[in-house]
Amino acid sequence: GTVSRGLAQVVEAAFSRWGQPNGYILGQEASGAFIVGLRYGDGKLYTKNAGARRVFWEGPSVGFDYGGEGARTMMLVYNLPATSAIYQRFAGIDGSAYFIGGFGMTALGNGNIIVVPIRSGVGLRLGANIGYLKFTPQATWNPF
């Protein structure tokens, strides 16, 4: 009940602000930070016209951010002209407050394309940071 309600409220907030996406990514990720942080994840990009495509993401962050988390992730993708356009960097500001579990939503952008990660995670993390996610067709350890 509470988990479903929390997720529904986060998705509703995204739809009311940005409308209906033309793609979405379902996946999982792990992240950790002690002032400087790293995030790694993988999933599948789904679009109405082009089907599914495997994607990986990684990225650095810096800020007043401490702890670690593992999360199931749904990313709403807006204004994606082609599936290959996802393979670039998307910058944004993120804030997290996890104590055992929680939800989070942020918005990342590059030009007209907006990616809205919605995370449901477990861990212990508190803080705010600025950073980016880099989407790639293959997994890599290099977040830059």
State what each model feature region is.
Residues 1-144:
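Small-residue-enriched, tightly packed secondary-structure blocks
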